[in-house]
């Protein structure tokens, strides 16, 4: 607290109390200087003066320079009286303002103290036991991310393998269709050969029937010729021996039989060789077809296994993505809650700073008021000292 004081010498007039003090002028009456108190933000200002003895007239300033100044012998006249009255009024209003500001300042200090007691930082919480859980969750998230990347890589590899197997399957399927087309062509050739064989068998049967018919005709002709030859022999006994027709027919018969047998053997040999060749080709293509079918079956089984594995990997990936999204959402909600708490604390801190700034401005304003009051008090003091000198001069002149 800063205090200002000044002393007054003896005078012959009297003034009433200023603020909480009182001034009386008269024979043997003491004058106590006014007391001014003001404060802002826990600081105070006081102005006090010493007492002096006076006599003669009496007057009063009550309620903080709120009284009326009285003088005798025309000591205070004209502008000086008005100036003193104006200073009285202004000082009274300033004191009222100071009291009101002190009351408001006290209320603000009480409110700030209550707010700090209610909103002050509580005991610091120990979050160290959450760090292990957070680190474990981070490790799990990192592991899940790595596992997800590995699964994605495996899925890509499986997709590439599936594409490769699909290409092989399409190639084998095209080869199978080509082999089936060749088999169908060979079957048509086999059908044609079967028809040719049947035709040849029918031709052989026809040749056999024709041979039998020729044999029968030959025998009939031989019988007829024998009958004719026998009749001629009986008629012409003395004639020379004729041509042996039986031998000629027998030779012709043997030649036809040899030719027929040769044709039959040639046809059977050609048919047999052709049939064996076709059977070998059919067996080779059948074996190749069986191999292709078994390979296609294996490829289809492998493709189904890869598709099942792909579906399982996709399901695992979806589950991991859901887990990751849930974890991110949970941590996002916690982070948003913490951010909201931080924002609320920052807002409260901003309010406190604004209140502090406002109180600082109020304090500066009160200091300005205090400076002006000090200047006016100095002016008031100079006026009082001038009046004391005037009273002293008048007293001295009366004594003389």
Curated annotation (Swiss-Prot):
Domain IF rod: 80-391
Domain of life: Eukaryota
Residues found modified as Phosphoserine: 14, 22, 35, 40, 57, 72, 395, 397
Record site feature (Stutter), residues: 267, 327
Chain coiled-coil ranges: none
Region (Coil 1A): 80-115
Impact upon substituting residue 10 to A: No effect on phosphorylation; no functional effect
Sequence segments annotated as region (Necessary for interaction with PNN): 244-390
Modified residues (Asymmetric dimethylarginine): 24
Region (Head): 1-79
Region (Linker 1): 116-133
Segments for region (Coil 1B): 134-225
Tissues expressing the protein: Expressed in a defined zone of basal keratinocytes in the deep outer root sheath of hair follicles. Also observed in sweat gland and mammary gland ductal and secretory cells, bile ducts, gastrointestinal tract, bladder urothelium, oral epithelia, esophagus, ectocervical epithelium (at protein level). Expressed in epidermal basal cells, in nipple epidermis and a defined region of the hair follicle. Also seen in a subset of vascular wall cells in both the veins and artery of human umbilical cord, and in umbilical cord vascular smooth muscle.
Pfam families reported in the protein's UniProt record: Filament
Region described as Coil 2: spans on this chain: 249-387
Keyword Phosphoprotein: yes
Annotated consequence of substituting residue 35 to A: Abolishes phosphorylation; induces perinuclear collapse or short cytoplasmic filaments
Residue numbers of Phosphotyrosine PTMs: 391
One annotated GO biological process: sarcomere organization
Keywords from the named record: Coiled coil, Host-virus interaction, Intermediate filament, Keratin, Methylation, Phosphoprotein
Function of the molecule: Involved in the organization of myofibers. Together with KRT8, helps to link the contractile apparatus to dystrophin at the costameres of striated muscle.
Family according to the record: Belongs to the intermediate filament family.
Notes on the domains: This keratin differs from all other IF proteins in lacking the C-terminal tail domain.
Protein name: Keratin, type I cytoskeletal 19
Source species: Homo sapiens
The gene coding this protein: KRT19
